[in-house]
């Protein structure tokens, strides 16, 4: 079941990191230099499940257009919740949460430089 959408970037990030930890993911965060709408720290978070040296990788990205991050984050969390404790058989799964954390927090399609990352 897909949980309701988060009401803010900070809430979505916290829920994603919790879901990733519960799935036994390897997690790495890449801080963003600016602050979010509520003064929160911004980051691109990456959770990886499965073989470290796997030949097959599935990349799942949310928030390329920041405002779309709310839905993408919920879908990533839903997928992570199906994985159990990290004993994933199959391709390595890499979840990139909030590729555009500034746009996600400020509810904008574009990043802090008014650039659409998908163009």
Model-flagged regions — what are they?
Residues 1-119:
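Structured catalytic-domain cores with a bias toward divalent-metal coordination
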């Amino acid at each position: 079941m897909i949980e309701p959408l988060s009401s803010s970037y900070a809430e979505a990030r916290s829920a994603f990191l919790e879901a990733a930890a519960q799935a036994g993911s390897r997690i790495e965060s890449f801080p963003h230099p600016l602050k979010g709408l509520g003064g929160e720290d911004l980051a691109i978070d990456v959770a990886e499940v499965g073989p470290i040296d796997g030949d097959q990788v599935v990349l799942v990205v949310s928030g390329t257009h920041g405002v779309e991050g709310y839905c993408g984050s919920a879908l990533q969390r839903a997928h992570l919740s199906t994985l159990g404790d990290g004993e994933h058989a199959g391709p390595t799964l890499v979840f990139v949460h909030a590729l555009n954390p500034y746009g996600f927090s400020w509810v904008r399609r574009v990043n802090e430089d008014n650039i659409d990352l998908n163009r």
